[in-house]
Amino acid sequence: IEKANLFLQGIIDTRALPDDDRQVDWLFSNPLSDGGQFTGVSDLLTKYGVVPAEAMPETFCSNNTSQMAMLLKLKLREDGLRLRQAYAEAAPKGKKADEAMVKKLESKKIEMLKDIYRILALCLGEPPAEFEWTRCNSKGEIVSVEKFTPKSFYSKYISEDLENGYIMVMNDPCRE
């Protein structure tokens, strides 16, 4: 959902550029990038939290993401074209008109993200708002049963400052 938001926001940010602009072309060629950096993961964990596998088990789609990714890319390209078309049809003149149009496009983006969320929830399951987790010792005996939200589980069991406690080391030979 975060990557979808980045793509759609990129479309809004490039709304006035021509369709054959290199940046616009790149966005439509790469609506969902594969992978990412450690900081992206740490940001997601900090924002949303985490759940144990027992609270949200794997699905067919989570183990086979290519079909889901293809569907999401098609949907995002369609939505990106709809945003660009809405801007082109309105053809706002002046800064105030453009700012008003951006607000309309951002409102459309929120509706589009709801569709993306629905696709993700159908493929991966609805993330639990709250769950009960049973902790067992090495003998399999129950030690505790607690209720958590994804963020409270993250705070209790990860409790690392992933944003400030680590640095990212990277080698990118193509930049040399």
What are these regions (language model features)?
Residues I1-E176:
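Structured alpha-helical subdomains that flank or immediately precede key functional sites
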